[in-house]
């Protein structure tokens, strides 16, 4: 049950990334998602959210890793999705 919840939260993030037009560096069906963001978007989001810089894609884009867990709430994901939509 716990594993299903974290993957479901990650899939919500995945859909938000794709809706924003961010490609996926790695196509993952797990609780880890790897969108490719502009460096500017990385700079904005890193002030409020924890994620890992995965790899520089080019001078203007960076692949990052978002990871959900058993403790990731709907509110956590809702807040990130809302902030993504504002970018």
Q: What are the language-model segments listed below?
A:
Residues 7:
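Ligand-binding pocket scaffold of soluble enzyme catalytic domains
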Residues 11, 15-85:
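Conserved C-terminal alpha-helix-loop-beta "cap" of PLP-dependent enzymes
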């Amino acid at each position: 049950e716990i594993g299903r919840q974290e993957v479901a939260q990650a899939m919500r993030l995945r859909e938000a990334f794709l809706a924003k037009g961010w490609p996926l560096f790695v196509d993952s069906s797990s609780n880890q998602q790897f969108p490719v963001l502009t460096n500017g978007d990385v700079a904005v989001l890193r002030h409020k959210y924890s994620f890992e810089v995965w790899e520089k894609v080019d001078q203007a884009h960076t692949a990052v890793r978002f990871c959900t867990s058993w403790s990731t709430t709907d509110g956590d994901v809702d807040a990130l999705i809302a902030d993504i939509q504002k970018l």
